[in-house]
Amino acid sequence: PIYGFASEFVKMKIAHLGIKSYDIVELLDDTAGQAESLFIGLEDYRDDFPIYVFNIDTIRHNFIKPGIASNCDGFLEIFLGSGSNWSFVEPGDNYSVIRTTEKDPISNLCSNGLYFFRSHFQFQEAFRGLNKSDLVKGEFYIAPIYNTLIRNGADVRYIEVSPDSISFCGTPLEYVNLLEEF
């Protein structure tokens, strides 16, 4: 891998967006998935703060932080879909999440890849509780972290968004379709 290129690209985009306060944590080794990458990236922070995570292979158009973020321990955005290549939500009452699965369709509520945790300390504690049986296809994914939080009494919610607010670009075909769209 060529290290340094990604941070320069990110700095350029941050400047373009006018973001004044930020940190870039560059990982120099492969990880066992997105959840481990996030865990490693947060290790040196001693103050607690909320975190938003978004999959790099998805574009979320016109995102605005929802008010629900101040009223729950975590949330994930979903769209109505099908297939087995998503994270899924088993819904409860009032948009609560009973459990999540990875690549295992338990409903038609598919995560678009946007995840919120009110406390990065909660996320880290839940990640530390994972073991090899929590790996899916050799990776630790973000969505299943919510199951630990839910078992510990956390209030995790989902928000439904329109498929029109999302563009996918994780496969070659999705990328080609995205290029044609723009």
Q: What residues fall within each predicted segment?
A:
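Conserved N-terminal catalytic core of the sugar/cofactor nucleotidyltransferase
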Residues: 1-50
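Conserved core of the sugar-phosphate nucleotidyltransferase
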Residues: 8, 12, 59-136
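Conserved beta-strand segments of alpha/beta enzyme cores
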Residues: 21-23, 96, 155-157
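Conserved beta-strand scaffold positions in the cores of enzyme catalytic domains, especially
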Residues: 24, 74-75, 158, 166
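A short acidic, often aromatic-flanked loop/helix-cap motif at beta-alpha or helix-coil junctions
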Residues: 29-34, 84, 164-167
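Short, surface-exposed amphipathic charged segments that create phosphate/polyanion-binding patches used
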Residues: 37-44, 90-91, 173-177
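Short beta-strand-to-loop acidic/aromatic patch adjacent to the donor-nucleotide binding site
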Residues: 48-59
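Conserved alpha/beta core of the MobA/IspD/sugar-nucleotide pyrophosphorylase nucleotidyltransferase superfamily
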Residues: 111-182
